[in-house]
Amino acid sequence: MMMRDGNISGPKKKKFTTKCRPFSFYKNRHIIMLINDESVYLYNLTLKPPSYYISSIVGQFYKQDNSTKNAQQLVLVSSTTLQLFEINEEAGKLELQSSQNLLGIINSIEKICLSEVDGVVITSDSGNLSILQYDNKTKKFISKIQEPMTKNGWGRNYVGENLAIDPENRCILVAAMEKNKLFYKIESNSSGSKELSSPLEAHSKQVLCLKIVALNTDHNNPLFGALELTPEKKCIINYYELDQGLNHVVKKKPNSSNSDPLPNDVNYLIPLPGHIGGMVVCGTNWCFYDKLDGPRIYLPLPRRNGQTQDSIIVNHVTHVLKKKKFFILLQNALGDLFKLTVDYDFDKEIIKNISITYFDTIPPALSLNIFKNGFLFANVLNNDKLLYQFEKLGDDLTEGELVINSSDYESLNSVRESVTSFKLKGLDNLALIDVLETLSPITDSKIIDSKLVTLSSHSYVKSITHGVPTTTLVESPLPITPTDIFTTKLSLESANDEYLVISSSLSSKTLVLSIGEVVEDVEDSEFVLDQPTIAVQQVGIASVVQIYSNGIKHVRTVNGNKKTTDWFPPAGITITHATTNNQQVLIALSNLSVVYFEIDATDDQLIEYQDRLEIATTITAMAIQENISEKSPFAIIGCSDETIQVVSLQEHNCLEIKSLQALSANSSSLKMLKSSGKETHVHIGMENGVYARIKIDTINGNLSNSRVKYIGSKPVSLSVIKFSNEIEGILAISSAPWISYLYRDSFKITPLLEIDITNGSSFISEDIGGEGIVGIKDNNLIIFSVGKEDSVFDPSQDLTIATTKLRYTPRKMITNGNRLFISESEYNVQGPFKCNINGDVKENVDEDYYEAFGYEWKQNSWASCIQVVDSKSNQVIQSLQLDGNESIVSMSAVSFNKTSTPSVPASHLVVGVCTNQTILPNSYDKSYLYTFKIGKKHLQLVHKTELDHIPQVLENFQDKLLVASGNHIRLYDIGQKQLLKKSTTIIDFSTNINKIIPQTNRIIICDSHKSSIVFAKFDESQNQFVPFADDVMKRQITSIMNLDIDTLIGGDKFGNIFVTRIDEDISKQADDDWTILKTQDGILNSCPYKLQNLIEFHIGDIITSFNLGCLNLAGTESVIYTGLQGTIGLLIPLVSKSEVELLFNLQLYMQQSQNNLVGKDHLKLRSYYNPIKNVIDGDLLERFLEFDISLKIEISRKLNKSVNDIEKKLIDLRNRSAF
């Protein structure tokens, strides 16, 4: 793959393309494929799914085998992904159990009670009503019911917009925003499974449905409350009752005594539990209880003391206690939680009083969930998700705390006129115990040193690195320079390691340390200390063997006394390599002989096998299975002829070579490990920095199904390590340490971060809290654990996120050397910071207060600033607060009269701002350009330039500032007091330019409304830009990037990705024959030439940035994109015709074989607005890895490939540029 930067010109223009023969045909059975040499073929993979969770629900979705309690789980659903978590009560953490890409766009989700466990009901763009149940064996949701209810796609009449389920599980209501409502009765068949009846229709013409809730009616007919809007723009409440006897839907209106007109600021409905029924209707600063044929009960909503902000309820959660008691937590848009309780007279069946008290303040959430075991999950809006634990229920109110009683209010007017305020307080009833890191929303990103740096969540810079964090526990110097390190326990029953053995081949010494509360020398180990140790192993019941260069020292403990036995090789012969487990010892001698020992189970003695194996070449490494209860049936021996040999250790053919495998280099380290009680793999570290894993058949010793990964420039050393009781893995050390492990049938290999060791060993000790790793670096001993300091190792997470807190919502990021310039603006917010663009100002701002309670809201107000972040230390080094009510709309680094390159940073930073800007309707008072000088340490204001237009786009073009607004493009140069206008161009057929990519003497213009993409060249004779080519398709573009000088990739606001290119001859003519080209007349109010459309693909998320690069070591350069909802994806160029053919045909068979959980056709999903073109969907293809073996074989036979070939291709594609 060859790519050229758009700012580099030259005589040749190399294309972003694949090397395929032109118009080649491939025929496999009935499939014919056309491949064009000029086309681009990409492979799409989702590296991180969207983390904007539209809903969260709690239920018992599966039963735990060894639990007597009815444990609850949490389901989080984004637009495309369904995830299931459970709470580890001991660690206080959320643990991911399952994550599924539904390959569809989810609209809403609710819980439904199935026969023994809970399931989920989903409405999606497939037009089906889907009921899913979790299968604990496969760790996946499976489809139980797919009920078609409407056509594919979205619309005002799409009935999946609102979803409500009767609390007694008798009926499901789905409703469109306009007109359509469908009622499905839930019935049980003879086998006890749930079925849906034919739908009953209830249409309301010319009425918009804003919200629907299912009401509790005990055993009466199912009833639903709806908030609706009439053509006169008046809000009304209607009730819909399903008459089960007549099988008919009845629309009912509130009691005549409750016919007071609703204020138009009503926004939320809250149903009450069964014995009470009815619902709470909420508006701005008020609420009332409403029940069909019952009186209304009014209450005001509390407001923050000393602030003018309204209290608007946006969220709630109901929790039922014992003896029919319950409480409801209401949350307003500011994040304040209020506890609503009802004093109910069971004898008279009336409500005596409703009270509201202030509970706590947490970040505003989309949904709240309470677990029976006392946890509260907050699905926080635009930030990390939070898990709290209840410390108390807020019943112990002190004197002076606010209590609102309904008995004090008689009408809606009295409630609306009342002002009830409360004083904010820190968390009192809740305690934060866990944070679920998310990226939504991502507004911009850059790749810096293989890290993806994003502007994401609410006011953060988040650096995403492939790797697992580590926590250093102990680091101390050693008296020798170590080359190897070992740990061992002294008896079979011991749970902890007791000896730490450090060997030095440089000084021919061995150091034995005891492991306990303190680490100290062992005086009575009986080990040989004046020679380097090759291996140490606890064998038998209570014995330890030390293998060193000149022999084996066997130390047995008998009745508390230590007895030693020595074994020596022949004179002049030394031991070079060894591998051991509790029952077997295998050593290699310098005369190329292999000697095998077994442990006598009766007295722990070493028994030498009489025959020896002679190897023809030098032995480089060897391994037998470790940490197993039985004997290893095979040994693996690495030889200097770049092969490994499988040697039998079974009685009938001991030391017989069974198979041989060629390698790409000599093996430097070998390990054999049984994975999750299923398959056994040989792990190979090679001298060229390659790590490989090969499956070994434990019956006949055959090797197959290899996986390779380049992990560094140095020879790879391997050690078996233990992460937990369930997971064992490999520590692989090259130029950096990595770990590999199998987790839920998925093999992961991940670098370790923030640690540098040259050798390591597993380390188990209660003093460090369990499993750890002990390593050496130079003359230092390092003990560390895998995972963050405050958490245990999570095998499902192989990405580490480092965060830097910002002030406001970040908009754009510019890299300039080692610094990041970040523009931040937030609407309807009044910032507490003072303007300091003209110099430093003393601040007295309690940032912890605003972090907890947020900034004060103010209508049509803006808070904006520029912050400078050091990309290496992730620290904010400068913050510039803007003056007054200014909003930042654009920013660019510019080199006036100086060429900017990655090694020569830009000289100035220009920021475009507007004053008193409003959105919907869009307006502003004035606009300016702030010009800052980029110094070595800080930004310094040079001058301020007033404009007569909004600076929508700023870019650096030919050492000048390019400013675009509407359909105008202007060039500015720097002056002493302000920027000086040098050129003006009007693009007649554009209306709203929102992106520009500068090239050497050309620019690529993007329009968000009309003309889509335009290529234009700067004509020096006319002193303006002349457009000469544009796109045939009109798009509303959100992000764009050059692939080469003629090819670009972009995304639009509807979630589509496209690649377009200008014809090579037209591009060459624009460079060589510009005089002729610029005189060509346009066609139909557009350019004379059109772009070629190469790629079309629907992602389902709004693309906010593209980057060229890779996220792994020595990977292939690919396109990495980010989405607004937190999506991170990868587009890998396919480089051969055979690769494209194989993946294309595999995709066809996968489309036929896979059952979509929501009933969405894959081709329709990826062709939402335009037919899919030249993109292979890796998300679909990787489901092949999850299929059962019979289906894998069926598909592979159709492709004339083996299952291993297809699996290897899919894994290699992922490893090509990512992880």
UniProtKB/Swiss-Prot annotation:
Keywords: mRNA processing, mRNA splicing, Nucleus, Spliceosome. One of its GO terms (cellular component) is spliceosomal complex. It is found in: Nucleus. GO terms for biological process: mRNA splicing, via spliceosome. It holds the Pfam family Beta-prop_RSE1_2nd. The keyword Nucleus applies. It comes from the Eukaryota. One of its GO terms (molecular function) is U2 snRNA binding. Involved in pre-mRNA splicing and cell cycle control. Associated with the spliceosome. Belongs to the RSE1 family. PANTHER family: DNA REPAIR/RNA PROCESSING CPSF FAMILY (PTHR10644). This is Pre-mRNA-splicing factor RSE1. It comes from Candida albicans (strain SC5314 / ATCC MYA-2876) (Yeast). The gene is RSE1.
